[in-house]
Amino acid sequence: MSQELTINADQLTEEQIAEFKEAFSLFDKDGDGTITTKELGTVMRSLGQNPTEAELQDMINEVDADGNGTIDFPEFLTMMARKMKDTDSEEEIREAFRVFDKDGNGFISAAELRHVMTNLGEKLTDEEVDEMIREADIDGDGQVNYEEFVTMMTSK
């Protein structure tokens, strides 16, 4: 597992690492190379992340191996790399939803689905379109909302 985490941190650009180091240093008050768990949320928010308290606690528990309440820079990098990866996929799904939701009302209708699929070169019958909607339509209202779309996209 630790090998996989290292790979994630290795995928950061030098610019990203420098940016994270700068933010890390701002909150490493005594300059000893560690930040306290309380400061973690502030650091992440300064980098455009918006973790919940539960997410922060989970990340701290995963990273703070010795349980002393502080995080060193390599641990911090690992955590940020993982967090960035999660954010990207979430943003990609949101972007895909916007593509399908032509009128921006928060729902994908059969007509919108047919339109996008046709633009992608997929000629579907009405039955095929209805079947796709039915598969994703958890609450049975005949259209697909964002939550249903996320479920569909992440269940594969």
UniProtKB/Swiss-Prot annotation:
The answer on whether this UniProt entry bears the keyword NAD reads: no
TM spans (from-to): none
What task does this protein carry out? Answer: Calmodulin mediates the control of a large number of enzymes, ion channels and other proteins by Ca(2+). Among the enzymes to be stimulated by the calmodulin-Ca(2+) complex are a number of protein kinases and phosphatases.
What PANTHER family is this protein classified in? CALMODULIN LIKE 3 (PTHR23048:SF0), MYOSIN LIGHT CHAIN 1, 3 (PTHR23048)
* Residues annotated for Ca(2+) 4 binding in this entry: D137, D139, D141, Q143, E148
- Carries keyword Calcium? yes
| A molecular function GO annotation | calcium ion binding
Binding of Ca(2+) 2 occurs at D64, D66, N68, T70, E75
Query: Which amino acids does the record list as binding Ca(2+) 1?
Result: D28, D30, D32, T34, E39
Q: Which residues carry this modification: N6,N6,N6-trimethyllysine?
A: K123
Further facts: This protein has four functional calcium-binding sites.
Protein family:
Belongs to the calmodulin family.
Positions carrying N-acetylserine are: S2
Report the residue ranges that make up the EF-hand domain in this protein: 15-50, 51-86, 88-123, 124-156
Give a single Pfam family match. EF-hand_7
UniProt organism field: Strongylocentrotus intermedius
Q: Which GO terms describe its cellular component?
A: myosin II complex
Question: Which amino acids does the record list as binding Ca(2+) 3?
Answer: D101, D103, N105, E112
Its name, as the record gives it, is Calmodulin
Keyword annotations for this protein?
Acetylation, Calcium, Metal-binding, Methylation, Repeat
